[in-house]
Amino acid sequence: MRVKVILACTECKQRNYNTMKNKKNNPNRLEIKKYCPFCNKHTVHKQTK
């Protein structure tokens, strides 16, 4: 089952990205290193509630 998730920057807490996640393959919270336009650098983005 694929669900829509929101990714937030760990440094500035801005919610920058929306993505899809397969709950069966990834039951834990998603963590991806992506570009944050507010920090102007690549940071770790975590899945929000």
UniProtKB/Swiss-Prot annotation:
GO biological process, one term: translation
GO annotations of cellular component type: cytoplasm; ribonucleoprotein complex; ribosome
UniProt entry tagged with the keyword Electron transport: no
One term of GO molecular function: structural constituent of ribosome
Record PROSITE patterns: RIBOSOMAL_L33
Cross-referenced Pfam families: Ribosomal_L33 (PF00471)
Keywords for this protein: Ribonucleoprotein, Ribosomal protein
SUPFAM superfamilies, per database record: Zn-binding ribosomal proteins
Family classification: Belongs to the bacterial ribosomal protein bL33 family.
Name of the featured protein: Large ribosomal subunit protein bL33
Organism listed in the record: Clostridium kluyveri (strain ATCC 8527 / DSM 555 / NBRC 12016 / NCIMB 10680 / K1)
Gene, per the UniProt record: rpmG
